[in-house]
Amino acid sequence: MAQFWAEGSLEKNNALVEYLKQYGVVRTDKVAEVMETIDRALFVPEGFTPYTDSPMPIGYNATISAPHMHATCLELLKDYLQPGMHALDVGSGSGYLTACFAMMVGPEGRAVGIEHIPELVVASTENVERSAAAALMKDGSLSFHVSDGRLGWPDAAPYDAIHVGAAAPEIPRPLLEQLKPGGRMVIPVGTYSQDLQVIDKSADGSTSVRNDASVRYVPLTSRSAQLQDS
């Protein structure tokens, strides 16, 4: 997916959401509302233009995804982010999408972010504390954990929604096992050439897979491999 407009052309979060609506990436009021509520600028490091439709580096060879990719994933998962549901964000990075999930599932649900770089967990916690999702982290319905995302987070499983923010060569089995029957996972799969795959698990535990788009994500890998060139 290519970016939709030139760098530096937008200065407000609401303007970003409006552009995403105009280009058909944000298609529902539910996704528009949460993206308007969680200001992307709070999750992008200083010195970068937060409302540009481009991924941004957040340190440690990690990025915050482009806004159109956040919108795409939220639209794909919105029916699995109803109040009271459980959501897992693998490779939570800046914490932006985990905060969006938390706002959608609400205080009766659970939104869990998994990140294997401890410094990013600290940063994402600080980001959320400045955002509209701060109260949800305080009451425990939103949490971040230092762990290998490929292993998921069994403590809050099963999950209605699982999002993976880095590309895996194949779908990690622990994530499939932690996906609730009737739930959905969105994950980029591949090495250089990647597809954003949508995995739906039926009530009997069988799964169906479809490709939604060709994408380019950083790899889902070990902490040591990620930090090797940082």
From Swiss-Prot:
Q: Where is the active site?
A: S65
BP GO annotations: methylation; protein modification process
**Record's SUPFAM superfamilies?**
S-adenosyl-L-methionine-dependent methyltransferases
The yes or no answer to whether the keyword Cytoplasm is present is: yes
Instruction: Please give one Pfam family short name.
Output: PCMT
Keywords, ordered alphabetically = Cytoplasm, Methyltransferase, S-adenosyl-L-methionine, Transferase
Which InterPro entries does the UniProt entry name for this protein? Answer: PCMT, SAM-dependent_MTases_sf
Tissue localization of expression: Highest contents in seeds.
Q: Name one GO cellular component term.
A: cytoplasm
Reported EC number(s) for this entry are 2.1.1.77
Location(s), subcellular: Cytoplasm
In the UniProt record, does the keyword Coiled coil occur?
Answer: no
Which reaction does this chain catalyze?
Answer: [protein]-L-isoaspartate + S-adenosyl-L-methionine = [protein]-L-isoaspartate alpha-methyl ester + S-adenosyl-L-homocysteine
Give the highest taxon in the source lineage.
Eukaryota
Question: EC top class, in one word?
Answer: transferase
Spell out the molecular function terms from Gene Ontology: protein-L-isoaspartate (D-aspartate) O-methyltransferase activity
| Known function | Catalyzes the methyl esterification of L-isoaspartyl residues in peptides and proteins that result from spontaneous decomposition of normal L-aspartyl and L-asparaginyl residues. It plays a role in the repair and/or degradation of damaged proteins. This enzyme does not act on D-aspartyl residues.
**Annotated family:** Belongs to the methyltransferase superfamily. L-isoaspartyl/D-aspartyl protein methyltransferase family.
Concerning NCBIfam families, the annotation shows: pimt
Its subunit composition reads:
Monomer.
Q: What is this protein called?
A: Protein-L-isoaspartate O-methyltransferase
